[in-house]
């Protein structure tokens, strides 16, 4: 009885400490311009099991897939709890999480996923906002309640065995080492891991292939069907804490249609050359808190999505009620990004106190005709940036699948300047009602770029208290309605403000009702 009483007291103390710790985020909800429930940490039973007790060997070569499955099943039979992964390198196939499971990596623990695609069966899923078939994710969970990945260890997806590679993104030594595995070349400077992956790419919609006619054809293109590393679908009460997530086959962390999501103190890494190596893609989720985390990746850093085109509109689940605070993004196509898959809508997002260091774009809003969806009520405050490769802020409704650097190098930006006006319908994307305050950046190619559609201008964007030093170009706007710039300081080598094809543009208290194709040029 005494032992039982001690265990109960220990559990109550742990729960009390956890509840107190989550209160440190209470200030983030103060004066929010939208209603949002406070995100909570999931609670788990006190049960614990150790991976080693189920036959796992942490030598980096012994396959531990069965041990992970047995350990999770054993915990589930007890009602859930903590699966302890001790120090070691645990080589494994896919891990399927269950409700009330906390996958806990102790210091020095590495979960390393096998590159053997035979271990990853095909599943029906969603990728890049489209319903499709992919390989099973290294870590996945579906329709779960209370699920966590915590600790001080590292999860590595062995992604270089899955991803295509562009020569200009790597050193000669890296190129030689990776392409020596075989595979196929789309061009002399663009490599795929198999002939089948190249075949699929030649007919794909971005990274979603044309549906094969037979199972044999599916197997032929299997390496093209790269999974996201962490796939959590329709889960409630999700917690990621303290872990390093790195080297994913495609996107790194992908919560889809989840609710009450807490991501704190994680490090998300991918090589800068990782194709589609996004850090976090929060898609069609509700009530999420992303805090004090670091991203250094090969694509978008922190990205908000909600499905693509007809599939996304049919699902119709927006990404809403999200707070991002105190995060750092190093390499990446964008620091904080919305789109391009946003067909279900995005609303009620607050981003504050973040720093972007060396990213291609700081704040990136992107979409294109065909998406549909409304992005609105986005509030951004206190952004610090340095060495931004293109724009501090981008709104571009002519997104074509390339990074901002690739668009710049290929001259695609100029191609969207003279365009036909289309009829507004459900496929027309809309970006409106976005406030951006207190932005400071040292070194960027351009301070800001607005590129709306003739039929749907980017509208009601308010930027206040922004200072950009050492830029090549200032603020360029085209096809906007209701852009307001207040207390803006830009040090650039050219004019600091250029506008055309826009209405109701306010620059430091002076409003221009209509700006035609000839445009205007000003200096702040």
Indicate residue ranges for each PLM-predicted region.
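Right-handed parallel beta-helix
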Residues: 107-108, 145-153, 236-246, 259-271, ...
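Short glycine/acidic-rich loop motifs that flank beta-strands on beta-rich extracellular proteins
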Residues: 80, 94, 114-115, 135, ...
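Active-site-proximal loop/turn and secondary-structure-junction residues that shape catalytic pockets
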Residues: 89, 257-259, 267, 306-308, ...
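Extracellular "leader-to-stem" segments immediately downstream of a signal peptide or signal-anchor
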Residues: 2-12, 17-84, 89-102, 106-234, ...
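Short, surface-exposed basic-aromatic patches at helix termini and helix-loop junctions that form
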Residues: 95-104, 256, 344, 372-373
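Extracellular beta-rich repeat passengers
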Residues: 362-524
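Outer-membrane beta-barrel domain signature
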Residues: 217-219, 278-279, 311-314, 369, ...
């Amino acid at each position: 009885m005494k032992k039982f009483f001690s265990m109960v007291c220990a559990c109550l103390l742990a729960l009390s400490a956890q509840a107190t710790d989550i209160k440190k985020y209470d200030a983030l909800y103060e004066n929010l311009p939208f209603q949002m429930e406070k995100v909570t940490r999931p609670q788990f039973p006190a049960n614990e099991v150790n991976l080693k007790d189920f036959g796992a060997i942490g030598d980096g070569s012994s396959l531990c897939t069965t041990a992970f499955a047995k350990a999770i099943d054993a915990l589930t039979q007890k009602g859930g709890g903590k699966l302890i992964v001790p120090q070691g390198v645990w080589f494994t196939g896919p891990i399927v999480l269950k409700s009330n499971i906390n996958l806990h990596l102790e210091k020095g623990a590495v979960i390393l996923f096998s590159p053997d695609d035979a271990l990853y069966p095909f599943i029906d899923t969603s990728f890049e906002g489209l319903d499709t078939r992919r390989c099973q994710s290294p870590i996945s969970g579906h329709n779960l309640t209370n699920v966590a990945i915590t600790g001080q260890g590292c999860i590595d997806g062995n992604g270089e065995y899955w991803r295509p590679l562009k020569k200009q993104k790597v050193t000669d030594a890296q190129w030689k080492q990776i392409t020596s595995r075989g595979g196929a070349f789309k061009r002399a400077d663009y490599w795929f891991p198999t002939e089948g992956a190249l075949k699929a790419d030649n007919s794909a919609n971005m990274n979603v292939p044309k549906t094969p006619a037979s199972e044999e054809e599916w197997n032929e293109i299997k390496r093209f069907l790269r999974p996201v590393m962490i796939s959590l679908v329709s889960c409630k009460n999700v917690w990621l804490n303290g872990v390093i997530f790195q080297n994913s086959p495609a996107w790194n962390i992908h919560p889809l249609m989840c609710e009450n999501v807490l991501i704190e103190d994680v490090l998300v890494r991918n090589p800068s050359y990782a194709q589609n190596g996004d850090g976090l893609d929060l898609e069609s989720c509700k009530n999420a808190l992303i805090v004090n985390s670091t991203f250094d990746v090969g694509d978008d850093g922190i990205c908000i999505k909600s499905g693509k085109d007809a599939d996304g509109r049919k699902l119709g689940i927006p990404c809403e009620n999200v707070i991002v605070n105190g995060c750092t993004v190093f390499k990446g196509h964008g620091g904080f990004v919305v789109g391009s898959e946003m067909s279900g809508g995005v609303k009620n997002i607050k981003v504050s106190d973040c720093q972007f260091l060396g990213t291609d774009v700081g704040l990136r809003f992107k979409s294109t005709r065909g998406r549909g969806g409304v992005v609105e009520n986005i509030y951004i405050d206190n952004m610090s940036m340095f060495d931004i490769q293109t724009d501090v802020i981008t709104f571009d409704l002519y997104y074509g699948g390339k990074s901002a650097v690739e668009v710049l190098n290929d001259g695609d930006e100029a191609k969207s300047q003279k365009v036909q006006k289309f009829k507004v319908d459900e496929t027309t994307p809309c970006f409106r009602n976005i406030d951006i305050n207190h932005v400071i950046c040292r070194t960027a190619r351009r301070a800001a770029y607005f590129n709306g559609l003739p039929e749907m201008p980017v509208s009601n964007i308010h930027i206040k208290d922004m200072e950009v030093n050492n830029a090549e170009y200032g603020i360029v706007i085209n096809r906007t309605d209701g852009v307001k710039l207040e207390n803006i300081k830009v040090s650039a080598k050219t004019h600091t403000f250029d506008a055309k094809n826009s209405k109701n543009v306010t620059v430091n208290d002076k409003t221009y009702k209509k700006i035609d194709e000839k445009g205007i040029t000003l200096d702040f």
